């Protein structure tokens, strides 16, 4: 029944959008719209979370199980850097409480669900904002959702590649004196934090481009802020990177600097196109019509000479 009610509300929303092209909405309509889009986002996250919960310990569509895939950076470390607590000599993480494994599986499944459902809830977020924009600005909906999902995925991939280097530095530094026995909760918590920080950070250049498209940020201003923004990227990486190891901090700062420069160049091209477009519009405008001038009075001398000839 709830699914049917949700589909009815969605149909009513799209019916209203066809009959109300100006998108004028009352406060109640705005709240209804927000509730509908939140329900759609939550439904997508629930479905993908269930998928992630199953994928955690099972191979799906020929893919390796999510748990093995996430554990690989830790297991790739030398055996001298991690505690050998498994009787069969296999790489295992430590569980210190009865419900650790179950709760960890839920956390990992939920994190995977949020990432897999990111195209859906990114679209719902932007679609809720677009009624306050002009019609031409709504065309950028798809252009916002697709790059946002790609950038988030790119950030998580970079974080995964950096993870083994970060763990190698953090765990091998004092391996001559002590050995690290990581619990599953601590390890996956560190991993998920790293993935989220990298994924969210990669959205910053997209935010710059969207502010420029909205007319709130220009290339000249970004050009004057370039050095300060690059410095801010590395400060952000140093403060928010989990573990504070030099590998992850440098990787995040360098990646954000490259993406920032790419965003600045896109803003420069967009501003050039905007100036050319405004110049064409100015040329197409009608010229100002001057008021008519008065006709000079007929000369009396010229009239008389004409009469003499006739």
Curated annotation (Swiss-Prot):
UniProt subcellular location: Cell membrane
Region (Disordered), start-end ranges: 291-310
Transmembrane intervals: 38-58, 109-129, 142-162, 190-210, 229-249, 250-270
GO MF term list: proton motive force dependent protein transmembrane transporter activity
One example of a Gene Ontology biological process annotation: intracellular protein transmembrane transport
Mode of membrane association: Multi-pass membrane protein
A GO CC annotation given for this chain: TAT protein transport complex
Alphabetical keyword list: Cell membrane, Membrane, Protein transport, Translocation, Transmembrane, Transmembrane helix, Transport
InterPro entries: Sec-indep_translocase_CS (IPR019820), TatC (IPR002033)
Pfam families linked: TatC
Purpose of the protein: Part of the twin-arginine translocation (Tat) system that transports large folded proteins containing a characteristic twin-arginine motif in their signal peptide across membranes. Together with TatB, TatC is part of a receptor directly interacting with Tat signal peptides.
Entry's family note: Belongs to the TatC family.
NCBIfam families attached to this UniProt entry: tatC (TIGR00945)
Subunit structure: The Tat system comprises two distinct complexes: a TatABC complex, containing multiple copies of TatA, TatB and TatC subunits, and a separate TatA complex, containing only TatA subunits. Substrates initially bind to the TatABC complex, which probably triggers association of the separate TatA complex to form the active translocon.
Name the UniProt record assigns to this protein: Sec-independent protein translocase protein TatC
The organism's taxonomic lineage, starting at the top: Bacteria, Bacillati, Actinomycetota, Actinomycetes, Mycobacteriales
């Amino acid at each position: 029944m709830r699914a049917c009610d949700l589909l009815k509300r969605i149909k009513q929303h799209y019916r209203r959008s066809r009959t109300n092209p100006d998108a004028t909405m009352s406060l109640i309509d705005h709240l209804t719209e927000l509730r509908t889009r939140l329900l759609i986002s939550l439904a997508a996250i629930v479905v993908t979370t269930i998928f992630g919960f199953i994928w955690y310990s099972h191979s799906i569509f020929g893919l390796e199980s999510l748990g093995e895939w996430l554990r690989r950076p830790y297991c790739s470390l030398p055996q001298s850097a991690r505690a050998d607590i498994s009787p069969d000599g296999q790489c295992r993480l430590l569980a210190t409480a009865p419900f650790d494994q179950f709760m960890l599986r839920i956390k990992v499944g939920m994190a995977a669900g949020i990432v897999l459902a990111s195209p859906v809830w990114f679209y719902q977020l932007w679609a809720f904002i677009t009624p306050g924009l002009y019609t031409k600005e709504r065309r950028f909906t798809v252009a916002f959702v697709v790059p946002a999902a790609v950038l988030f995925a790119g950030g998580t991939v970079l974080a995964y590649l950096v993870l083994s280097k970060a763990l190698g530095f953090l765990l091998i530094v004092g391996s001559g004196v002590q050995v690290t026995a990581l619990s599953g909760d601590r390890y996956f918590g560190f991993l998920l934090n790293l993935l989220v920080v990298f994924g969210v950070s990669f959205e910053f250049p997209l935010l710059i481009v969207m502010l420029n498209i909205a007319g709130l940020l220009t290339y000249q201003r970004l050009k004057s802020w370039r050095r300060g923004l690059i410095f801010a990227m590395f400060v952000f990486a140093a403060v928010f990177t989990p573990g504070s190891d030099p590998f992850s901090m440098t990787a995040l700062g360098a990646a954000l600097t490259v993406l920032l420069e790419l965003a600045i160049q896109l803003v420069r091209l967009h501003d050039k196109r905007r100036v050319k477009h405004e110049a064409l519009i100015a040329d197409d405008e009608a010229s100002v019509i001057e008021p008519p001038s008065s006709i000079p009075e007929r000369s009396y001398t010229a009239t008389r000479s004409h009469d003499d000839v006739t």
